Amino acid sequence: MLMKLIVTLLFLPIIFLGSVRAQNKNIFEASNLLLFSFQENSFLISGDSIYTVSDDPLTAKAHGLENLTYNFVSQGDLAYLVNSSNGVVYSFEKQVFNRLGQSAPFLSQFGHFPFIRSSKLFTFGGYGLFTHKNIITQFNAATGETALQPTITKQNEMIPGLCKPMGQFIDNSLFIASGEIYNEDSPFKLDIRHSTEAWNFDFDTLEWFYLGQTNEMLSKGYRLSVLNYPEGSLYLDFDTAFSLDFPNNQIHFYKGSQMLNLASIEALTYNPSKGGFYIIKKRNRVQKELLFLNKSEMLGDLVETYPIYTNTIPWVEYGIILIVFSV
């Protein structure tokens, strides 16, 4: 009896928060759900409204966005919303979205990796029109146009086209690993294959550099991502949570909280000012709830660290070296 009471008391704050937040269950059923955090607040896009979920009680207003699915990315006081296939871009200032340019959705970069550099929105990769992309694009807010980022690396010596890559932008370098890659045996993504390579694009030299072969634990890809997590880009699958710290070549595997089933999470965001996560999770087959969890409640306290990649020479270069030495 005493043990049951202790467990109930431990879970009570979380259950109470969920019941207060989930005032209207219909807000969790929209096809364009997006949880994101900016500065001290966290928000939920659902249907034609944006909800400030960090307010108590939550507040709502119309967002004025096109009815698309979006990715959110921020850096300092800058924030952008870009549609999932690139092309449609909004800034986010004073909790208001402002359309930048009048481009239509590109339909060619689903599953791209967004980041901000020199106050500009950039994207890498994506899939669309039956091709995997290995391009970097940059959006010019002044002109409302998107342009290709130049590189001096030859096409046959650079990163392959990827959809849903894992990445991190830091110190003027873009790091990319894993991602869905073109499968010559199933070119229309009927059978997905993942890249086993890690790459770095240096914006100072405009070159792509091969880093090595990725940890086999990255071979499954991911389901959800949090790019503003302080320990590196955070990724979740149905039974795994890990963050990537590319500058230190470290992948941190979080062994999980006993309070949470990762497979039940449908959306999440990290709020730095609160030091925790807002998540939308399934309570059962028909009910969902919005919760706030601290890091320990979300990820657990046990962390295992491994290298993201091992330094190996690509087979093409290895063959060239063998030929040179044999001569």
Residue ranges, per PLM feature:
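Repeated scaffold domains used in trafficking and secretory/extracellular systems
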Residues: 24-39, 64-76, 106-115, 157-166, ...
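Beta-propeller blade signature
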Residues: 134-144, 189-206, 241-249, 288-306
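C-terminal single-pass membrane-anchor helix
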Residues: 304-327
